[in-house]
Amino acid sequence: MRICRSFLFLVKKCGNITPTIWRNQHTYKMATSASANLSKIVKKNYMELPQDGKVQAMYIWIDGTGEAVRCKTRTLDNEPKSIAELPEWNFDGSSTYQSEGSNSDMYLVPSAMFRDPFRRDPNKLVLCEVLKYNRKPAESNLRHSCQKIMSMIANEYPWFGMEQEYTLLGTDGHPFGWPSNCFPGPQGPYYCGVGADKAYGRDIVEAHYRACLYAGIELSGTNAEVMAAQWEYQVGPCEGIQMGDHLWISRFILHRVCEDFGIIASFDPKPIPGNWNGAGCHTNFSTKAMRDDGGLKYIEDSIEKLGKRHQYHIRAYDPKGGLDNARALTGHHETSNINEFSAGVANRGASIRIPRSVGQDKKGYFEDRRPSANCDPYAVTEALVRTCLLDESGDKPIEYNKN
C-alpha cells in the first residue's frame, strides 16, 4: 500500500487494528468517461433548436439482468397526454439478455410516463413493460405480477417509501474522491457531512434531485451516507404500483446524470469489502389501518407475519435471490444478520425498525431494512403485500391468476 502525503491513522476494523490512510485529494486523478469531455456548450446549441411540434419519447425498460435499464427514442407527431396515446414498440432481446437471436423481437408496452429532464418539455420518458414473442411477461418483467397483486388490495391504500443508497465510482471502479491505493479517513464525518473533505460528488446529487422533481418523481429528500462517496435519496410516499415506477425512473435519471458527469452510480450492496457500510434500499410500508389511530396493532401483526417468512423475503429482496445481500447483511454496519429475523423500536441493527415516533404515536409505518440497493422495487413491494395483507405463508408465492 502506497503511503499518501498525510497522516497515518490506526483504526479498529472488525476487532483488528488496521492501518487506514487519510485521503489526499491530489494523489489520484479520477477516471472518467471520454464522453464527459465533449463540449456541453456545443451540444446546447443543437438542443435549443425548435422541434416543430414533434415530440421525442424515450422508451425505458429493465433488461435481462433485472438490474440495468436500457432505452431508445422514437418521434411522435403530438405530445401524448396519457399512456393510452403511446404506441407499443419492439427491440432486439438477444442483445439485452432477454431472448435468443433466432426469435429476438420483444414488445415494449408503455406503462408509466414522465417529463424528460434532459430534453425538457414536451418530450417524455416512458417506462415500459417487456413482453416476449407470445406476449407473456419477460422473466425480468416483475411489474406485471406486482400490478395484479396491488389491484387485489387497493382498498387497503398501501403506501411505500424507499430509501435508495448508491456509491459514486470512477469508470475504473474506484470510489469517487478516494485516494489511489489507500483509503480515506474512517467512517464518521461523512454521514450528512458538509465540506470538500466530507462530501464527495454533491454536484451529481443536486443535479439528480432537480431532474427528478422536474420529471414528476415523488423524490422526498437526499443525504450523504456513512461511507465516503456514498449517497441516499428517498422516493415516496407512493401508493401501490407507483412505488416501483418512480424508483426505476429515478434510477434511470441518476445513471443519465452520472453519464453527463462521466462517472458511475453503483447500486452494489457491498461495493467496498471490509469495515465500510454497504448500500441498501430500506423500504417503509403502511396501510390506511396502520396510519389511523390504534394502527400500531396492525404494524405489530404484520411484523409477526414477516418473521415467519424471513427466507422468502430474503430471496425476493435482491436480484440474485439473496446472494448479493449475503455480502451486506452481516449484522454489522447498521444491518441485521441475513440468517436471523429481528424487530425493534429505533433499532437500525434489526430486520424491521419501528420508528420512535411511531412507537410513541401508536400509529404510522414500519421500515424493512433488508432490501438490497440493487433490489427490484416491484419484487419488494409485492412481497410485503403478499405476506402482510394477503396472509400468505410458506416459501413460495401463491399464483392467483395464470393470465
Swiss-Prot record:
Domain GS catalytic: 142-403
Binding site for L-glutamate: N275, W276, R348, R369
Gene Ontology BP, a term: glutamine biosynthetic process
Amino-acid positions noted as binding Mn(2+) 1 in the UniProt annotation, renumbered to this chain: E163, H282, E367
Cofactor(s) demanded: Mg(2+); Mn(2+)
Gene Ontology cellular-component annotations: mitochondrion
Chain segment of the transit peptide: 1-14
One protein family per Pfam: Gln-synt_N
UniProt function note: Glutamine synthetase that catalyzes the ATP-dependent conversion of glutamate and ammonia to glutamine.
Protein name per UniProt: Glutamine synthetase, mitochondrial
